[in-house]
Amino acid sequence: MLFNINEKGEPLVISFAPFLSPEAIKHLQENERCSDQSQKRTAQQIEAIYTSGQNILVSASAGSGKTFVMVERILDKILRGVSIDRLFISTFTVKAATELRERIENKLYSQIAQTTDFQMKVYLTEQLQSLCQADIGTMDAFAQKVVSRYGYSIGISSQFRIMQDKAEQGVLKQEVFSKLFSEFMNQKEAPVFRALVKNFSGNCKDTSAFRELVYTCYSFSQSTENPKIWLQENFLSAAKTYQRLEDIPDHDIELLLLAMQDTANQLRDVTDMEDYGQLTKAGSRSAKYTKHLTIIEKLSDWVRDFKCLYGKAGLDRLIRDVTGLIPSGNYVTVSKVKYPVFKTLHQKLKQFRHLETILMYQKDCFPLLEQLQDFVLAFSEAYLAVKIQESAFEFSDIAHFAIKILEENTDIRQSYQQHYHEVMVDEYQDNNHMQERLLTLLSNGHNRFMVGDIKQSIYRFRQADPQIFNQKFRDYQKKPEQGKVILLKENFRSQSEVLNVSNAVFSHLMDESVGDVLYDEQHQLIAGSHAQTVPYLDRRAQLLLYNSDKDDGNAPSDSEGISFSEVTIVAKEIIKLHNDKGVPFEDITLLVSSRTRNDIISHTFNQYGIPIVTDGGQQNYLKSVEVMVMLDTLRTINNPRNDYALVALLRSPMFAFDEDDLARIALQKDNELDKDCLYDKIQRAVIGRGAHPELIHDTLLGKLNVFLKTLKSWRRYAKLGSLYDLIWKIFNDRFYFDFVASQAKAEQAQANLYALALRANQFEKSGYKGLYRFIKMIDKVLETQNDLADVEVAAPKQAVNLMTIHKSKGLQFPYVFILNCDKRFSMTDIHKSFILNRQHGIGIKYLADIKGLLGETTLNSVKVSMETLPYQLNKQELRLATLSEQMRLLYVAMTRAEKKVYFIGKASKSKSQEITDPKKLDKLLPLALREQLLTFQDWLLAIADIFSTEDLYFDVRFIEDSDLTQESVGRLQTPQLLNPDDLKDNRQSETIARALDMLEAVSQLNANYEAAIHLPTVRTPSQLKAAYEPLLEPIGVDIIEKSSRSLSDFTLPHFSKKAKVEASHIGSALHQLMQVLPLSKPINQQTLLDALRGIDSNEEVKTALDLKKIESFFCDTSLGQFFQTYQKHLYREAPFAILKVDPISQEEYVLRGIIDAYFLFDDHIVLVDYKTDKYKQPIELKKRYQQQLELYAEALTQTYKLPVTKRYLVLMGGGKPEIVEV
């Protein structure tokens, strides 16, 4: 029940329907099942929408309508009296939050239109108005709200900013690291610390590897609930626990014994084959058969009697025995077919070799790890202190502050728990432990609603942990009193061809060991409508493999990028779809695993005329060719003796010196100088005093003179003008901005150059001045291996989409091509010198000196890198986690398709026919095999091989070079734009002649009106201040009563230790204050403070305003009192526009500006302008701004047809306010 007030002030009572009981939900499900609606809600969707009063975990498979369920549940809550602001709704991205908010808004509008109850309309309208304030957003956004509101409780200012720029973070980290590193190198335990650094960096001079280790440990800790506690208690957990053979986890022993038994079973299967050759011609057992029987018998015995014969303490002995028993090769050959019987066991043995030696030396690395723990803790504290000082934080800092606020303040925590009716989370499978802790603190323990799909958890690189979802799933199934699990299995997106192949692949591939979930019946995809089950034979999934037999047979299949042949296969299929099926390009999407090395796709598609839109690449703004050319130009202007930058500028299209030119210049050295820079050689070449003046011909001399003249003008301008103007002068002088417009990706290149000028402008506005500092800042960003954000440009709509699998999540496309299926999964992390694990902490490779094991030797030391036991433990878990995420990536990619999915790869046809496994023992691929295979393609081929008797719903086709000829690929059919029978089409010469005439006419016009071409259409009084004097006659003028101004904001790293307040910001704040100051009240400090709160400036700027000086102006000067006396005649901050004529080109242009204040009387006008400039004598500013006030007076006179009798400058930049009449 809710009370509202009507127009007469009378209470309106709204009675809401109660939440549905389980019986009512079942009744609703039955009614829906029996209804004749074309699109019915499933029973599980209804259950997820209406179940209340308990924790709910919704496991929503791909395309099952989870967003629909969330929106319907939110609407149902609202209709039952739960205000939208009492729901906490967390989304994974800002974009998802915006889309969800829009859907709720549309539902509310629809509900208002359908409702006839006036009271309900009022209530729903209120909900609509509250929607923009509701807590619908990312966890980061909510954490910012909490800290902004309650940060004071833990000593954090509410006036903070978020450091989203990686470059800024990198610079601050580097400063903290360098200072801390110096301190540790000079402490008491310095020898141990030096040994630690050498273990990772090789020496103490190059600290890059050690620095990366510290940064990674810090970042990893930030994803935990409490970074400090994790570093103190968990960081060395495995190092303290696993120090003996007996400490090896049982699971690892079980995997080894399983591999031994599997090997024995496989070998027995092979020996039982008819063609194996058990007997010799004489009828006795063959030597091979006898040897293999011995292996089978001993492996089986050792597995069965492991505890009696060996136990954990004897594990090292078992490894030696098994290694000595089995052959060194992986294969057993029968009738020329190779069976990889021993391959898996060899890999397992490799994991356990040298354990005894490793454990002997492992204890020596523990003091190093303690030093690392101390350093990372100190770094975390020091880095946070710097951020607090700057009042600039990362998102993880804000989340931890929010957790701390809620943990340490019971009243604040309880207020949130009481306020929120329900805590809803989308994409729950991608939460990390920090976010989970925050959600737990917001919930009252029985009001959580979590939606996700563990099969789509693909953000481990953001420290997302799918086990959070998994643990909830298990807990709620075992203990229903804790919460309810609801499965959404019906897929409403894809045709049966896509659903069937997805089920076939993952039922053989995914389980809890690899994939983190058993892909059984409760997780399989089911068509949600009859229309999806209609078969289309031409939409069967295709695994298209380029046959690499004719390539270099030893070429690795794990190349980073996709091959030209694979892209050609894709182009051929797209041309066929477009020509034969009429499929529009925008219905086709190419999915890749990463955003790099995809240029060959765009290049090949351009050759075939297929339009394509790419997702871009990594941030490479500063590495784009056009930006690098401009940066080298700026470096040369700053220091012409920088040879690298100078050569780059000379070779650039701006001056186009070739190798021959540079060689001739390089020979113009001074024999008396040992070192001679290129700039000096250029100067000697011009005056003919080089070592070989005869090499400088007239053409080259002319180019050199032009270069030196241009460079000289740029260097002179750099001392006088702004960076922004300098960059545009370079563009205009050498036509570089126009040049890039003629190159590939012209729009992107021009956007990059334009952004460079804007970023330079923003840099100077942030408090830094000068070319040198700008270059230094850019170089510092590059040193930290960071970059600035890329510039986005509009993309064509009718084109094939190319994007990463991660980017495609949540989207759907009719036709999907999964490219580069032969690319090996990135296992870089498992080969690093350290591996981190949330439970076990850190495991490292230890650089041990094993000189003592070698006896007498002349060597000073023998260093060997050893994988410590904690490292091996973490490595195995990381390997499985990586494979699991890759498996889920494949699931996400396949389930994006609506109609058909293609897999594109490259393989040797002859090698692929080797038997993967002699016998299938289960519905799943053997675990050892799944761990061993490292590409999507390998998984698919193994499934096709082992389960060949089943219908797997995809075909494997090898494509030969003969299938990829120009004739075989074909070409796009484009509409005929011209009539071939029309004779006018043959008059090409006439058309070309006409075009040339037009170009000539344009050139003549450009010459005649050159001044007008370079004339801006809009100018400001400031730009005209020193341009054209005296002022020429105006033609038209108008005063604009109301206007809004918008400022473009381009963010660059801010490196200052203390916030710098710009004079321009103070001036802007003063003008705002003078505009809003109420003159009807007495002007005093309180009046000014009240008005100051209403202006749009930060606190530093407000604090910098001298309110006493403003008060003095109104109280102590006659003009200030004039303001208060004649306030009814006063107009403040009035924009104007005036049409003027350029004295050179005689072209018209618009002059715009804003008049600070003027008094309009019946017969005259008084003009006032405020200035905050610093000055020595008032006459300086009078001369500086006289012309500007003349322009203002002229605009007023033309508008009102009245004379401006008085013009005043109010000077606020001195010790006291001064009034100057102009």
UniProtKB/Swiss-Prot annotation:
Gene Ontology BP annotations: double-strand break repair via homologous recombination
Keywords: ATP-binding, DNA damage, DNA repair, DNA-binding, Exonuclease, Helicase, Hydrolase, Isomerase, Nuclease, Nucleotide-binding
InterPro entries named among the record's database cross-references: AddA, DNA_helicase_UvrD-like_C, DNA_helicase_UvrD/REP, P-loop_NTPase, PDDEXK-like_dom_sf, PDDEXK_AddAB-type, Restrct_endonuc-II-like, UvrD-like_ATP-bd
CDD domains: DEXQc_UvrD
Binding site for ATP: 60-67
Gene3D superfamilies: 3.90.320.10, P-loop containing nucleotide triphosphate hydrolases, PCRA, domain 4
Domain UvrD-like helicase C-terminal: from-to ranges: 524-810
Keyword Transferase annotated: no
Assigned GO CC terms: cytosol; DNA helicase complex
GO molecular function: 3'-5' DNA helicase activity; 3'-5' exonuclease activity; ATP binding; ATP hydrolysis activity; double-stranded DNA binding
Top-rank taxon: Bacteria
Cofactors named for this entry: Mg(2+)
Keyword Iron: no
UvrD-like helicase ATP-binding domain boundaries: 39-495
Subunit structure: Heterodimer of AddA and AddB/RexB.
Family: Belongs to the helicase family. AddA subfamily.
Protein name per Swiss-Prot or TrEMBL: ATP-dependent helicase/nuclease subunit A
